[in-house]
Regions:
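Short helix-capping/linker segments at secondary-structure and domain boundaries
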Residues: 42-45, 81-85, 132-140, 169-184
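Phosphate-backbone recognition surface of nucleic-acid-processing proteins
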Residues: 61-64, 70-157
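Low-complexity, acidic/Ser/Thr- and charged residue-rich accessory regions of DNA metabolism proteins
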Residues: 107-108, 144-199
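Glycine-rich, often acidic, oxyanion-interacting loops/wings at catalytic, nucleic-acid
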Residues: 1-59, 189-191
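A residue-level signal for conserved active-site and pocket-lining positions in enzyme catalytic cores
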Residues: 38, 126, 168
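Conserved acidic
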Residues: 27-30, 34, 118, 156-160
Length: 199
């Protein structure tokens, strides 16, 4: 009874009648104005991000990697901080909570999984950038395919994405720490192919 009556009253207020067209146009105009205001805010935030990213030595070189954008670089740098405080990329993996742990008890050897003890936002940034990179970046697609098809210990979907993300951490670390340019061929050569290992 009462709920149905309330629903009918709300439907009547939102229905497009004689005045409905005017209300709909006004609502659409307000939504467009709000959208334009958000675009301007986004441009301002992006400009500040860009200014801050350029202050970090060699950060601009990370943007030469296909699929890595300003937001990814800014997010990575804000979570990791000064790269000089790390002695190896494994420390960044640990910071992200991407080091492997084995779930076992007694004589039983369980599945390995990531610890998730580190920074959740850093893990999220890496995971979000890896999905499109695996699709659109040829060398990272090869890295992913290697992890899923290698003869010894092939990884499944999410595990392979995490392993490729760890590879991206190593690339970021090397570029930021040593100031080298990104080299897709070097990344490809780092993949130990099953055929060459068997030969």
């Amino acid at each position: 009874g009462m709920k149905r009556a309330q629903t009918l009253v709300e439907a009547a207020q939102n229905s497009i009648g004689l005045d409905g067209g005017i209300c709909a146009r006004m609502e659409m105009q307000l939504l467009l104005e709000d959208y334009r205001a958000k675009e301007i805010q986004l441009e301002k935030v992006t400009a500040v991000l860009e200014t801050e990213v350029w202050k970090v030595p060699h950060a601009e070189k990370l943007l030469s990697i296909k699929g890595v954008g300003l937001v990814t670089v800014a997010g990575f740098l804000s979570e990791v901080g000064d790269i000089r405080r790390f002695n190896s990329p494994k420390q960044i993996q640990k910071l992200a909570g991407l080091e492997l742990k084995e779930n076992s008890s007694g004589k039983h050897r369980g599945r390995t999984s990531i610890s998730k003890r580190g920074r959740k936002r850093l893990r999220k940034i890496l995971f979000q950038v890896m999905l499109p990179m695996i699709q659109n970046n040829a060398e990272f697609r090869e890295v992913y395919e290697y992890f899923t098809t290698r003869q010894k210990n092939p990884l499944k979907g999410k595990q392979a994405i995490i392993a490729a993300g760890c590879k991206l951490i190593r690339v970021f670390y090397t570029i930021l720490k040593h100031g080298v340019d990104y080299d897709p061929q070097k990344l490809r050569m780092d993949i130990i192919r099953p055929e060459s290992a068997a030969a």
